[in-house]
Amino acid sequence: LGKMFIHSPSKFILDSMALFTQSKSFEANSVLGNSRLNQLGLHRFRVQFAAQMAAQRRSKLAKFIHPADVENFQKNGFIFRENFLAAEEFSQLKQELLTTPLETRETLQGDTVTRRMALDGKTLKHMPVTRQFLHSAKWRNLLNYVASFKVQPISYLQVIFSHVRKAKADPQTNLHSDTFHPSAKAWLFLEDVAADEGPFVYVPGSHLLNPARLNWEQQKSEAITAKTDVMTRRGSFRV
């Protein structure tokens, strides 16, 4: 650490301060990526501390959602609802989403194109059904509970096209952990997704910080080198 400070005092100070933030990149942060510190349990501590703080906040938010949803999340790490909306409301929402012209951006990763259309404040002015749904307490309370605090989510209409070219598989299909701290993502599917069309996959119970999970976090943090895959080096551990 002394050598790191002497080499670049300002970077060392900034990297050290990032320990108390959501920063996760092992390659961009000299402190987070320090192998000796991670052998001593730095990454493991950050994982445990973040989970404890999230659990405390969720305990205060649980009253805003159904007890069955709380139970499912605590057991599985996610909340799954079929027919989340009434048939008529869902039909109106789907019709509005599929017929409203939206600015589109897309990314190409491996053999997969992901196309997203932002549902921001400007767009939602012309989409009353979608706006009502995204702002509803029924939807927001679930997001807040899983995230463990009142969030300002970024919402998109998303379409994924798999196997569009001969290339390596989409790296997002590799089982992975997005980051070291609890986070929230949510999907309302407009169509059923077949097994060969890239359905969302989550390992039930993988959010639990049992000894096996903590040992995995520890081992991954210790093993990161310049040859480790880029997503893991950036803090999104691949399984």
Protein language model features and the residues they cover:
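Non-heme Fe(II)-dependent double-stranded beta-helix
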Residues: 2-76, 82-173, 215
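Conserved hydrophobic/aromatic beta-strand scaffold that supports enzyme active sites
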Residues: 78-80, 185-189, 202, 236-238
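Short loop segments at secondary-structure junctions
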Residues: 83-84, 190-194, 205-207
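Residues that flank catalytic or metal-binding motifs in active/ligand-binding sites
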Residues: 126, 155, 182, 196-198
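Glycine-rich, charged/polar anion/phosphate-binding loops
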Residues: 171-173, 187-188, 232-233
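Short, conserved beta-strand element in jelly-roll/cupin
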Residues: 179-195
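Double-stranded beta-helix
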Residues: 196-239
